[in-house]
């Protein structure tokens, strides 16, 4: 009788283990599918460039946030550009294939415009600028061993591991996107997907990438997040944008 009970318990543990594994795999596939189908969201994007030789004087970059709609690309972003020890407030739009930017505030504000990207790619676009929505990164969701999993109630966070194999893969993907063959003295990343298992929906995407190329003293850190996924986004241009000057470059 004791052996029979032990046999039943062993069988149950195998079944439960299989269910747990299948549950993780099915969630990863849902994350992959949902991410490919994202149409809009609330975006944050930032870039920080620093140089060891220049110290804080050489720090440049931007911090922007706003709404983005994919295919065709439309966005509204507010934030600041930093450089030479100064911050410049900016407001950027892409609407109907035209890129608009407002530099400065109040009476000193100046509007510029130029033809927008024809390939739906832009530095401030989460879809084209993030690691999360890259097809090669999404393919890594096919293997659950690639991911660390943490659970908080109904929310499950999948974070790409940092094994040598995966780090080399991310380097390869990054170079492929840049169409360059760079070698790095520093390379670190975080790539996360937050999934709500109750609603069966993706809730948040996050990434950061910090790199230093061999033979240089400069370091670049890029970060981004996408939340309020598939929110309704209606981009309206301010009246003053009608007076925007044409950008030559």
Where are these regions (language model features)?
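Positively charged n-region of N-terminal signal peptides that target proteins for export
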Residues: 1-8
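Nucleotide-cofactor and metal-assisted catalytic machinery
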Residues: 11
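C-terminal motif of bacterial Sec signal peptides marking the signal peptidase cleavage site
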Residues: 15-18
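Subset-of-secretome marker
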Residues: 20-249
């Amino acid at each position: 009788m004791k052996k029979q009970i032990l046999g039943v318990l062993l069988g149950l543990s195998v079944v439960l283990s299989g269910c747990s594994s299948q549950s993780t795999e099915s969630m990863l596939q849902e994350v992959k599918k949902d991410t490919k189908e994202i149409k809009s969201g609330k975006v944050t994007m930032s870039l920080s460039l620093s140089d060891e030789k220049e110290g804080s004087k050489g720090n440049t970059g931007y911090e922007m946030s706003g709404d983005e709609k994919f295919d065709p690309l439309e966005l509204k972003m507010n934030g600041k550009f930093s450089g030479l020890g100064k911050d410049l407030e900016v407001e950027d739009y892409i609407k109907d294939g035209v890129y608009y930017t407002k530099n400065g505030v109040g009476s000193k504000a100046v509007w510029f415009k130029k033809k927008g990207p024809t390939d739906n790619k832009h530095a401030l676009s989460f879809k084209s600028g993030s690691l999360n929505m890259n097809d090669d990164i999404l393919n890594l969701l096919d293997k659950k061993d690639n991911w660390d999993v943490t659970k908080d109630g109904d929310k499950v966070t999948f974070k790409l591991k940092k094994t040598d194999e995966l780090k080399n893969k991310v380097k390869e993907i990054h170079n492929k996107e840049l169409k360059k063959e760079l070698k790095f003295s520093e390379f670190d990343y975080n790539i996360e997907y937050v999934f709500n298992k109750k609603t069966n929906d993706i809730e948040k995407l996050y990434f950061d990438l910090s790199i230093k190329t061999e033979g240089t003293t400069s370091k670049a850190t890029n970060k981004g997040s996408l939340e309020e996924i598939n929110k309704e986004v209606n981009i309206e241009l301010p009246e003053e944008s009608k007076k925007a000057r044409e950008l030559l470059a």
